[in-house]
């Protein structure tokens, strides 16, 4: 199954709010759910997958392996546990959530386990998240060209991550933009508001449309039905080349996700 360009992000959502969010999203037409081991919500995602009328084969499911599961012999059992919680026998995409902090576990150790997970049928595609260009190059050296299908990374008009984006595009690595609305910071950007006014859409929809126009997948997180519907409607927003260029001027390196164990960013 090809990854749908619009997905449901589940970061910081748990329990009943998450169940309601996912069921509403599926009813609206979303067919892509993004979760992670560290989110501690795979069981809720699994409950929805088990009870929805939407067939599992119609839903693109991603989870991410946490850094505590990288050591030799740990990654595959951790993914099997994720599958049990998710109540499914396969993932569409399994990602390395972050590079091993301070390279405590050699990259080859966890990437080779991820490849094995794919060969065992636990996941259909594999990829990484939050990797720098140097780390992506190292990963390609370890696994060979074409092995890494995907990179998930923070991208929005205020943090455009151009070096990483360009490298991924050169290598044929698909990109998912997380935090595509920069925790709502894009909503008050005058350029986005002005473009939105012209198209009769919101600044948030313009931000999403800008990412989508570059061939990226986006996974905004929202618990409100009207916001979920508006995000989906961004798929229909068509920006001119002039508008795309205007939005490109908003770059200011405003990173939202920068934990102390993050790599040295490009």
Residue ranges of model-derived segments:
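N-terminal binding-site loop/beta-alpha segment at the start of enzyme catalytic domains
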Residues: 1-59, 113, 182, 263-264
């Amino acid at each position: 199954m090809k990854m749908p360009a619009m997905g449901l992000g589940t970061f910081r959502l748990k329990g009943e709010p998450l169940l309601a969010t996912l069921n509403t999203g599926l009813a609206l037409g979303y067919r892509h759910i993004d979760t992670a081991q560290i989110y501690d919500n795979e069981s809720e995602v699994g409950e929805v997958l088990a009870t929805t009328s939407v067939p599992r084969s119609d839903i693109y499911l991603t989870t991410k392996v946490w850094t505590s599961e990288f050591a030799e012999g740990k990654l595959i059992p951790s993914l099997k546990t994720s599958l049990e919680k998710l109540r499914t026998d396969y993932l569409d995409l399994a990602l390395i959530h972050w590079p091993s902090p301070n390279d405590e576990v050699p990259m080859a150790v966890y990437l080779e386990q991820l490849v094995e997970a794919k060969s065992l049928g636990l996941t259909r595609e594999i990829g990484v998240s939050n990797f720098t260009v140097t780390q992506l190059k190292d990963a390609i050296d370890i696994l060979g060209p074409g092995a890494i299908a995907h990179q998930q990374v923070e991208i929005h008009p205020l943090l455009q991550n151009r070096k990483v984006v360009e490298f991924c595009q050169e290598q044929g690595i698909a990109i998912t933009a997380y935090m595509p609305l920069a925790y709502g910071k894009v909503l008050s950007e005058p350029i986005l508001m002005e473009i939105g006014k012209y198209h009769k859409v919101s600044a948030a929809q313009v931000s999403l449309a800008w990412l989508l126009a570059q061939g990226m997948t986006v996974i905004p997180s929202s618990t409100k039905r009207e916001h979920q519907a508006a995000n989906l409607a961004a798929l229909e927003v068509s920006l001119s080349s002039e508008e795309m260029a205007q939005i490109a001027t908003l770059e200011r390196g405003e990173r939202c996700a920068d934990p102390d164990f993050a790599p040295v960013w490009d």
